[in-house]
Amino acid sequence: MSVDAATVRKIASLARIAVTDGDVEAMVPELNNILGWIEQLGEVDTDGVAPLAAVIPNHQRLRDDVVTDGNIRDKVLANAPQAEHGFFAVPKVIE
């Protein structure tokens, strides 16, 4: 794939980026070089190579899934503007 000045202007328009004619002419060879590198990557033989997300093996450390109330009710309710009987007190919305 080859990029020309019209394509650069179209991309700039879609991205809402203001570019001058000088910028457009400078971007054409740069974008063509980038696309050339991408084409080279597409030529690499990756048959038999397993996909991976990281270079080093990562093991996710999980904690036991235990239900708990946190035992910090009083600290949480201290942040509330109003609390009654261990719950948040809110004004009545529906009559």
Curated annotation (Swiss-Prot):
One of its GO terms (biological process) is translation. Keywords: ATP-binding, Ligase, Nucleotide-binding, Protein biosynthesis. SUPFAM superfamilies: Glu-tRNAGln amidotransferase C subunit. It catalyses: L-glutamyl-tRNA(Gln) + L-glutamine + ATP + H2O = L-glutaminyl-tRNA(Gln) + L-glutamate + ADP + phosphate + H(+); L-aspartyl-tRNA(Asn) + L-glutamine + ATP + H2O = L-asparaginyl-tRNA(Asn) + L-glutamate + ADP + phosphate + 2 H(+). GO terms for molecular function: asparaginyl-tRNA synthase (glutamine-hydrolyzing) activity; ATP binding; glutaminyl-tRNA synthase (glutamine-hydrolyzing) activity. Belongs to the GatC family. This is Aspartyl/glutamyl-tRNA(Asn/Gln) amidotransferase subunit C. It comes from Rhizorhabdus wittichii (strain DSM 6014 / CCUG 31198 / JCM 15750 / NBRC 105917 / EY 4224 / RW1) (Sphingomonas wittichii).
